[in-house]
Amino acid sequence: MAAAVAGPEIERLIQLLAKLPGLGPRSARRAALHLIKKREALMAPLASALQVAIERIQVCKVCGNIDTQNPCTVCTDPRRDPSIIVVVADVADLWALERAHAASGRYHVLGATLSPLDGVGPDDLSIDALVARAHDPQVSEIVLALNATVDGQTTAHYITDLLMEAGVKVTRLAHGVPVGGELDYLDEGTLSAAMRQRTLF
């Protein structure tokens, strides 16, 4: 029987860190050691930030974003265009669009995409709330900012069908050549989409 490498408290820390995305047991062990070595500079502030997150962070009742206020700062920002709702699968996608300063409207977070293989159906997503928001007279466009995967496209088609009676314009993000991309390295699907969605120069 192998001897314990660390005490139970440290092993518990390692096990919890290993549950984070992208951290396996070995990476979690290294992260735990780093935190312990930097106890005052890193571990204590991290513990404090986690406690604040537990106490204050909540899900926005309007769009599904996470924030310390409810409704969130995006929903209450008067500079946002209330006529546009940008639909994303999860909060990470919302953050990506915000970092790029790519969206001027408000958001709606579905929580995931439809994925029959993973057991994710329409009832698991925030689709009913989106349809209700689309019927607001202020709303004129729904932008489907979903991944260009099979699940993302399936979700986009499903939502588009539901929004037909709302009388809003439904658009989706363009797919094509990335900035700095070389054609020789792109897959056929991306090249085909880029050709179909070409614009005037």
UniProtKB/Swiss-Prot annotation:
Record's function text: May play a role in DNA repair. It seems to be involved in an RecBC-independent recombinational process of DNA repair. It may act with RecF and RecO.
Gene this chain is encoded by: recR
Protein name per Swiss-Prot or TrEMBL: Recombination protein RecR
Zinc finger intervals, C4-type: 60-75
Pfam families hit by this protein: RecR_C, RecR_HhH, RecR_ZnF, Toprim_4
Keywords attached to this entry: DNA damage, DNA recombination, DNA repair, Metal-binding, Zinc, Zinc-finger
Coiled coil: none
Molecular-function annotations in GO: DNA binding; zinc ion binding
Organism: Rhodopseudomonas palustris (strain BisB18)
Similarity comment: Belongs to the RecR family.
InterPro entries: DNA_Rcmb_RecR (IPR000093), Rcmb_RecR (IPR023627), Rcmb_RecR_Znf (IPR015967), TOPRIM_dom (IPR006171), TOPRIM_RecR (IPR034137)
